[in-house]
């Protein structure tokens, strides 16, 4: 389910079945890296939407967590987000990012970080981009499934 009024109505009616939140993490940079961060945003937006589509009814796709790449308190802010999510009885929190800097902070996050290199979709034909996204979705869904199966009871 997406963070839209229609999907949130559906979530409210079936929240006991929705135990997983997906939070895309996307940097914002100006200057020489602006196009690259735009490409990352495009890739993660499409990828997270496809994951949500495959797992509708089990996953709530949160709005993207945007941050300035040189922002020092991004971890604290993200922890506040995740605390609110946990307060609302979600068992699984997954972060999806292409920013390698998050790998350095993975232990501090206490949740599942899925780092995946961004594919510059603007360089691909539509059918190539779709196939690449589908392959990535399958790999990420394997990670989700593994975590669901191995959750602590």
Show where each model-derived region lies.
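Extended, histidine- and acidic-residue-enriched regions that form the cofactor-binding/catalytic faces
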Residues: 1-153
């Amino acid at each position: 389910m997406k963070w839209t009024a229609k999907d949130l109505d559906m979530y409210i009616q079936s929240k006991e079945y929705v135990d997983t939140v997906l939070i895309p993490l996307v940097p914002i940079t100006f200057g020489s890296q602006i196009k690259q961060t735009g490409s990352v945003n495009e890739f993660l937006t499409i990828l997270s939407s496809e994951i949500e589509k495959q797992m509708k009814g089990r996953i709530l796709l949160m709005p993207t967590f945007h941050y300035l790449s040189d922002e020092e308190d991004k971890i604290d802010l993200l922890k506040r987000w995740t605390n609110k999510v946990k307060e609302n009885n979600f068992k699984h929190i997954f972060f999806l990012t292409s920013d390698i800097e998050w790998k350095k902070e993975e232990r501090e996050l206490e949740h599942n970080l899925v780092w995946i290199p961004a594919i510059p979709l603007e360089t691909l034909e539509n059918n190539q981009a779709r196939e690449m996204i589908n392959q990535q979705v399958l790999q990420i869904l394997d990670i989700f499934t593994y975590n669901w199966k191995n959750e602590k009871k």
